Amino acid sequence: SYQFRDDIEWLYVLPCIDPSGRPLPDLLHSRFPRAHSFIPFEVQDLCWDKTATQKRLLDRGVPTPETLLTHDPDDVEHFVRRHTYAILKEPRGCAGTGHWVLWFEDSTLMADNGWAAHPLRFVGDGPSRIVGDELYYAPPYYVQRLVGTFQRTGFEIGQVLRAYVVESEVPFWGERYREHYRRPGDWILNVARGARYRFVLSVSEETKNTALRAARAVGARVAAVDLVRTSASGPLVLEVNVDSYHMCIDRSFKDLPEFRDYYDFDRHVAHALLRTEETTGVRTLRPARPRQRQRRPRHS
């Protein structure tokens, strides 16, 4: 259970649940009645919903890859034929879960998630699932052009960068990559799918400004903004991720030999919280003094 505290002014929320099934924002408001979430709950919900995030970015003029939101399978097939490769994404999720690279093999639309490739079959409803050797997938369909270049040796994925944004600054950058690309699903560059991290010491001013515009567009004071660029195009925003009760930003880059305090994302976030305390006049938090036992209604 969560202890009642009325002396807490700010909360930094990470994934958690209420065993009773009540919406977490309601639970936290009942336990911490004076507290504000450093990342507002509406921002957490927005960034958890990839289609809603995409619409917000487009509305604010933030550059993104060509994107299709549709219920029509014919639209998906036409989109893939036009771009050769595309990524089909679950509307909600993280760590690359539900991502499939799409392409045509002869006349068959194929989908590869990095572990296996399946013929894609569109169905009317139900969750995505493997039936036999086929992937059954129901609408809505959220599809993005796979950004890269065609070389003599084949398709080459663009450079995927992550901007770690804290209060309108980008203290450091990372890149996700693979040493080898053996199958279309390897173009899903997520650490949970076997990709690697490395730090990037400098980026263009345009890339930095694009990342900051994306964070501002969704209202995020702290965010990890994923972008892709090639020698001919970009930067384009892929996603905006925030720490939330739905998910948290990956910190496994702390295991890199090159890691230094400067790359400590949590340290930058803590400094932002302290600055907020100083500018708003919030008092330093102390442990709550013991209260006399009172009968309180139980929350369910």
List the predicted regions and their residue ranges:
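Phosphate-binding site of ATP-dependent enzymes
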Residues: F104-E206
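Conserved N-proximal alpha/beta basic substrate-recognition cap immediately N-terminal to
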Residues: S1-H78
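Protein kinase-like catalytic core scaffold
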Residues: A86, Y141-Y142, P171-F172, A223, ...
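Short, surface-exposed coil-to-beta transition loops
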Residues: P23, I157-V160, V222
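A conserved acidic, glycine/proline-rich C-terminal tail/linker
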Residues: A211-A214
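Short glycine-rich anion-binding loops that position phosphate/pyrophosphate groups of nucleotides
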Residues: C16-P19, P91-G93, D243
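C-terminal active-site "lid" helix and adjoining low-complexity regulatory extension at the edge
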Residues: R198-S202, R216, A220, R229-S300
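Hydrophobic alpha-helical segments and helix pairs
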Residues: Q54-T108
